[in-house]
Amino acid sequence: SAGQSFGAFSSKGLKLVLKGDANDYVGKGLSGATISIRLPEESNLVSNENTILGNTVLYGATSGKLFAAGQAGERFSVRNSGAVTVIEGCDSNGCEYMTGGTVVILGDVGDNFAAGMTGGMAFIYDKSQEFEKKVNPESVVWQNVETDYWKENLKNLIKEHHEETGSLLSHIHI
């Protein structure tokens, strides 16, 4: 395990690759670096069924990228103002107070998603059709991805996630 604050305040030009899990505050204050977190080759775990990141990931991130082959805990991408990320699920309060950046979640989200979110974009793969029950509707609107531009943008991010993490789940969505 990488412990607390893996990649905190990492700047442009730095790339961190972790084979294993990380605890809370991964990418806190991320400032341009790329962080890739994947399961070790010898692992028999299914990435999208397991948590690989702790709580409060990308807190206050301003730029950079995070790719993780697994789920995040609570308060994922809180106060994100510019980072781009692809993960495979998160617990409650995801994208809380987010003001910018792009979040792609290839799995379920927890309750109170996007509370206080005022900017940025979040793409959620809603296989269980539960998103509407979990999103906080007070500051966001949501809809299906309908234009070719956004479909291509999303496809490219998922492809990059697959390249960075080897995720089988992202390979399905390319």
Feature locations, PLM:
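Long, distal/terminal scaffolding or interaction modules
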Residues: 1-172
